[in-house]
């Protein structure tokens, strides 16, 4: 069944040419096509030349967006003893031990990110049914299994986020708000590109970057010139 495209989106699609845009031009177009009646996010959809069914072609890592995400995230921490108090002092919205594990097992998921200390991971791992479908299971690669709770909480609150390639090799990331300046969005998109390059899976063969599209939440897809993005040198802010 063909999905019906709204008249609004049809009009916006007319503004987008069937070509790859220079990064800054693409971001200006993203802002121009963010016309929904709510604050839209800036999305990146990046197709990579990897097959994640092979372990040496999986991509899961974190990126520190220099201009932040524009979102307020609720951080939960599972730890033991004094680490629970440390998490609360560092700004965790929710922190607990066995009692929090019990709440989550019963369906409590009122948070956007879960951090756990390594010593509680055997218990947290049993919450796969609750956490897995929402992408909330802590992982060392994602920076969410650590004893350094203060640093982790501060980084994620400031704009660090975890991402992964899905099973088709596509990375979907929100890299800011459409209300950000084009320059700020460019700084975030560049940080994302550099992180993906730096974490290229060892088993990736052939052409790594296949395509990059960006859009506002309710806007049309805009292709970004991959080579122009990778070659771009930004002055330090």
UniProtKB/Swiss-Prot annotation:
UniProt keyword Repressor, yes or no: yes
Example of a GO MF term: rRNA binding
InterPro entries: Ribosom_uL1_bac-type, Ribosomal_uL1, Ribosomal_uL1-like, Ribosomal_uL1/biogenesis, Ribosomal_uL1_3-a/b-sand, Ribosomal_uL1_CS
UniProt xrefs under Gene3D superfamilies: 3.30.190.20, 3.40.50.790
Family: Belongs to the universal ribosomal protein uL1 family.
Protein name as it appears in the record: Large ribosomal subunit protein uL1
Keyword Cell wall biogenesis/degradation on entry: no
Keywords in alphabetical order: Repressor, Ribonucleoprotein, Ribosomal protein, RNA-binding, rRNA-binding, Translation regulation, tRNA-binding
SUPFAM superfamilies recorded: Ribosomal protein L1
